Amino acid sequence: MSLNAEQTATILAEFGRSEGDTGSTEVQVALLTAQINHLQGHFKEHKHDHHSRRGLLRMVNTRRKLLAYLKRTENVRYQELIKKLGLRR
């Protein structure tokens, strides 16, 4: 249920600040968003998968905290990121 290596590499190339950047806030949020979007399709088929739903909620909360941190520290990068990811419509 996780992303494969190609998808991860694509996200790292698009959102990373440099090559091999896996720890920046933008990359972490982008990876979490991709995993969350992937799991949403899973839950359309498996409505009663509560074990995975707990993991989804954990990812959503982690992403929320990372976005709050980015907004507090670097608002311009925050605005660019949510526009790129299509969050907060």
UniProtKB/Swiss-Prot annotation:
One of the primary rRNA binding proteins, it binds directly to 16S rRNA where it helps nucleate assembly of the platform of the 30S subunit by binding and bridging several RNA helices of the 16S rRNA. One of its GO terms (molecular function) is rRNA binding. InterPro entries: Ribosomal_uS15, Ribosomal_uS15_bac-type, uS15_NS1_RNA-bd_sf. One of its GO terms (biological process) is translation. This is Small ribosomal subunit protein uS15. It comes from the Bacteria. It comes from Shewanella sediminis (strain HAW-EB3). Part of the 30S ribosomal subunit. Forms a bridge to the 50S subunit in the 70S ribosome, contacting the 23S rRNA. Keywords: Ribonucleoprotein, Ribosomal protein, RNA-binding, rRNA-binding. One of its GO terms (cellular component) is cytosolic small ribosomal subunit.
